[in-house]
Regions:
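Intrinsically disordered, low-complexity segments enriched in polar/charged residues with Gly/Pro
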Residues: 21-23, 29, 66
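N-terminal acidic leader/helix
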Residues: 1-24
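Short amphipathic alpha-helical interaction patches enriched in hydrophobic/aromatic residues
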Residues: 15-18, 38, 63
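Short, structured secondary-structure boundary patches
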Residues: 11, 40-45, 66-67
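Short, charge-rich amphipathic interface segments used for partner binding and complex assembly
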Residues: 26-61
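Charged low-complexity stretches with an acidic bias
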Residues: 1-8, 56-67
Length: 67
């Protein structure tokens, strides 16, 4: 996984589609969903870490733009 789109496609494999309309909220919900999948041991550590890193980076970029 290298992009937010790839994370969305990854989550879709588990039946999760997230769209609220607020990009930051969408990313935060994706992060929460990934945590749930990881804690349920449905995804591997590497996938979890990579996805969380990408999401947090994107959230930071969006928050910096809003400031």
């Amino acid at each position: 996984m290298k992009t937010v789109y790839e994370i969305q496609q990854f989550l879709k494999q588990y039946g999760t589609i997230i769209y609220i309309g607020d990009r930051v909220a969408d990313l935060e919900l994706m992060e929460a969903e990934l945590k749930e999948l990881y804690q349920s041991q449905l995804i591997e550590t590497k996938d979890f870490q990579t996805a969380i890193l990408i999401l947090r980076h994107e959230i930071q970029i969006l928050r910096d733009k809003q400031s």
